[in-house]
Amino acid sequence: VNERASHMADIAHEALKPLIVEDSGAFERRILREPLGVVFVIAPWNYPYMTAINTVAPALIAGNAVVLTHATQSLLVGERMVQAFTEAGLPEGLFANLFLDHGTTEGLIAGGAFNFVNFTGSTGAGRRMEQAAAGTFTGVGLELGGKDPGYVMEDADLDAAVATLIDGAMFNSGQCCCGIERIYVIDRLFDDFVAKAAALVSEYKLGNPLEEATT
């Protein structure tokens, strides 16, 4: 989280500076990156700090105020993030955490309470966010559940392919929006791939994620 926030701060000056389209004797045309206003961040429970900081940090750096609401499974993350920014010296009133149910969230969006909405979560919930914002001209950014494929081609290193793709599918118990959800394997390698993948997964041990013996 610190690394991501620091990187975004480091690149902010270059990323936010005006883009000069034309500078001639007749015209100066430029694109200015101005704050949007109040950015509403709806963060998920998986990777709760990282997924939130991905929007919270750049929104604040760009001069916006931020309202954060977290998934019901990770409510305290929002409180702790606001506390951390406050202790770091962020002026009061620029970053707030709210506990909201789905109906209230959709009502605030539909009422035009925010200038931009960023949502990370399921496709179904993202559809409701989009519908709530319809007609308000509020910008909406949606990062929804993916259907990410993996491909194993003719010249693939089979052991490396198995290790990489199975890790991509199982990492964080598969609770990742960019996790591998299906794999396409060239016919010649298919049987060997399945056998190696099954053998690898059979070695996994389910259990308490805080215990080292758990895969």
Where are these regions (language model features)?
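Rossmann-like NAD(P) dinucleotide-binding subdomain of oxidoreductase/dehydrogenase enzymes
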Residues: K17-A160
